[in-house]
Amino acid sequence: MKKLLFVFAGLAFALTAAAQEFRITHGPYLCDMSQDGVTVVWTTNRPALSWVEASPADSLAPAPPPRHYQTVAGRKLAGRTLHAVRVRGLQPGTDYRYRIFSQEVQSWPDVNNVTYGKTVGADASRRRAYGFRTFPAAGSGCSFLVLNDIHGKADVLTRLCKRVDFSELGFVAFNGDMSSSVESGEQLFKDYLDA
């Protein structure tokens, strides 16, 4: 009887997991900003091929912006749930708009045979794309915020940042001790990234 119960429980779990829509679960987050580039990071609930489309904010170009992929030795990385796409070739002190996309990898039986599924974008419910400004040329100033010693207390982080106008900051740095210990990737989002 116990075996039968475990079989039904496993089947119910598998059906529930399969029924979940493919989606972006966290992000996007901007990392490693410079005068001429930025890395855009996000996660999905299933493996995917992901890309960023970025263009100057004042651009009126009717053509779609170029796609930037996460690559190694020129090969696009797919089959991952953590996506970190470097956008290169940007101009210093310039406003950009960007969108992120992930296309589900449904199966990948061998290196030359990938079946892709649904494509999702994090800004589908937004009227406009996300935005950022690259760091200014050398000698220009910028404002930033340094946070540390939160130790997984997201409520403390939320209270500390309540009056911060993030639109006035060039960047936010997490200096250390943001979690007391890390047991899973999901904990990082719960402890401070999604706060």
Predicted regions and their residues:
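Alpha-helix initiation/capping motif
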Residues: 8, 56-57, 127, 153, ...
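Acidic, histidine-bearing metal-coordination/catalytic regions of metal-dependent phosphoesterases
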Residues: 18-146, 166-167
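Active-site neighborhood of divalent metal-dependent phosphoester/pyrophosphate hydrolases
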Residues: 109-110, 139-195
